[in-house]
Amino acid sequence: MDNNYNDNVNGWAEMEPSQPMGGLRLPTQNMDPPEQNNESQLSELPRMKIDNDYASPIERQSVITSGTNNYEPKVETVTSFFHTGIDYSNFGMLDQTTMQPFYPLYSGIPVNTLGTFSGYTNSIYDKPSLYDPSIPTINIPSTYPTVAPTYECVKCSQSCGAGMKAVNGGMMCVNCSTPKTTYSPPVAYSTSLGQPPILEIPSEQPTAKIAKQSSKKSSSSNRGSNGSASRRQGLVCSNCNGTNTTLWRRNAEGDPVCNACGLYFKLHHIPRPTSMKKEGALQTRKRKSKSGDSSTPSTSRARERKFERASSSTEKAQRSSNRRAGSAKADRELSTAAVAAATATYVSHADLYPVSSAAVTLPDQTYSNYYQWNTAATAGLMMVPNDQNYVYAATNYQTGLRPADNIQVHVMPVQDDETKAAARDLEAVDGDS
């Protein structure tokens, strides 16, 4: 079965092949065009006949109708509205299909009323004029006057001007934000001949702390006059209404109380009952008199201990000086003995070392005729054996020796403990004698 298609085909017909098939004829489609609802807008459809090449009593016919619709152009009037100017001069090198509208900003924006777009074409160069010189324009300034914000100083509550500084919680003016430089008064030094410089502090500054001893003395001297001073001030105990006390205190509320009421509340944590108030003279402790006539046993014992410490320190100093003197004396004696022993002239040792004239025969050589000790010589002595190759003459040997006149004796300091103990014992013996 063959199908033939073409553009804008509204009808088609199928024909049987040339050979009959069972003697049946297929129904054909109605070739008449469909009814149109709007007869005024559609033209009469043209008809075209297509002959088939098959030689068959049943012909195949196709009707092709053009699908063109004829509409009458309508022109409508556009309602007038406002348009702003558009600069088309920059669009000359752009593609019309990809061109985007460009809206430049102007300081003075013209306002114009446009009617219908008569004579408007598709070309970008044939734009209608959007500016009319006869219509007034509205000038909009490019800049607006701005008002500087005002701030209030968080410290002095005044308006902050130029030079203000941002701080935590607000702004601070230049006067409050500028650090104040404080200068301490100079310290005066008085220098006098023969005396060390004394530091003088001006009266504006607080004076230095007083020594502990002077503070104790002043407190002990003023303790007796506390009662009279407190009575002169007119203080009254808020608990017992008493005025005679040696020391004024304050309770938890800050009210003045006497010494008895203050101590009672401190120990028992309850106010002192008024029934415990005693009239008459106050009981005070027995203290040392200022004259010093009456001395307690403790004071005498302290004086004795002080004297003993002084005497013992004196004795220790004396013993140490004696020890140093004895040590120096022992060093001098040791040095003198060492020098004397080193520089003393040798004496005859004939009785100590008897020399025999008998020959001593050895396997390798024979020694005989040893020189005797020279008792008259003032130089050092030496025994020289009788050498078979060279004989030392007695005269040459004696004249060739010189006395030892450059002997230097170095006395080393005592280092070991035993020697030190012996030196101390020697000093003790010298001191006793």
Curated annotation (Swiss-Prot):
One cellular-component annotation, GO: nucleus
PROSITE patterns, per database record: GATA_ZN_FINGER_1, GATA_ZN_FINGER_2
Single GO MF annotation: enzyme inhibitor activity
GO biological process, one term: negative regulation of transcription by RNA polymerase II
Modification after translation, per record: May be ubiquitinated in response to infection by B.pseudomallei.
Major location category of this protein: nucleus
Compositionally biased spans, kind Low complexity: 211-234
Changes seen on gene knockout: Animals do not survive for long beyond hatching and frequently die at the L1 larval stage. Upon attempts to feed, food accumulates behind the pharynx and there is blockage of the brush border that surrounds the gut lumen in surviving L1 stage larvae. RNAi-mediated knockdown results in a reduced body size and reduced gene expression from zinc-activated promoters and of genes related to the immune response. This reduction in target gene expression is enhanced when infected with B.pseudomallei.
Tissues in which the UniProt entry reports expression: Expressed in the intestine.
Entry annotated with the keyword Transmembrane: no
Pfam families: GATA
Assembly and binders: Interacts with lag-1. Interacts with pha-4. Interacts with rpt-6.
Role this protein plays: Transcriptional activator that binds to the consensus sequence 5'-[AT]GATA[AG]-3'. Predominantly directs the transcription of intestinal genes such as ges-1, cpr-6, pho-1, ftn-1, vit-2 and lev-11, and itself. Required for gut-specific differentiation, specifically acting with the GATA region-binding transcription factor elt-7 to control normal gene expression and promote normal formation of the intestine. Regulates intestinal gene expression in response to hypoxia to promote longevity.
Protein name stated in the entry: Transcription factor elt-2
Gene: elt-2
